[in-house]
Amino acid sequence: MKRLGAIIAGGKATRFGSDKAAAMLNGRPLIEHVADGLRSQVDKLIVCGRAWPEMDWIGDYPFPDMGPLGGLNAALHYAQQNGFDEVLTAGCDVVPVAQFPMERPDERAIYIDGHYLFGAWPVALAPVLQEHLRDQDNLSMRGWIAAIDAQAITLTQIFHNLNAPEQLSQYAAQQSNIGIR
């Protein structure tokens, strides 16, 4: 199976108050921590929704500023056009990155329970999502997951969604206390 990794990074970061992707964690931008976690699981890695130095990127599709579904839609279409079977997604603000199961009981899309941007999406969903997005009032990730009957999976790994500078500071302090740099 050929997998495309996509970091969803086109949000406005209103709760964070500044560019989350560029926020520093242990001396490196947050997006680079996410990229490191995805690289070992995919054949190619891209950033969706914004440019980032030294990484391939694509804009949201079909329009900018569509939120996570615009990034996922862009990634699915890119994957479809370039011979990938599946897209693994992660937000630019959640660490550490999940290790997705390689084998699953069926072909449904999966996402990590409580972390909707951590998902594995079959490329066959590209036209389905495109149709879903025709309704501009239907940009909810949760709504999309329900519409396609994606399967929630539970992992024992703990994730940290860093939506505010204070959360980033707390996470960095925890990492420092256990000797992670």
Roles of regions detected by a PLM:
Residues 167-173:
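Short amphipathic alpha-helices within nucleic acid-binding modules
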Residues 173-181:
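C-terminal intrinsically disordered extensions
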Residues 1-138, 143-158, 165-166, 178-179:
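Nucleotide and nucleotide-moiety/phosphate-recognizing core
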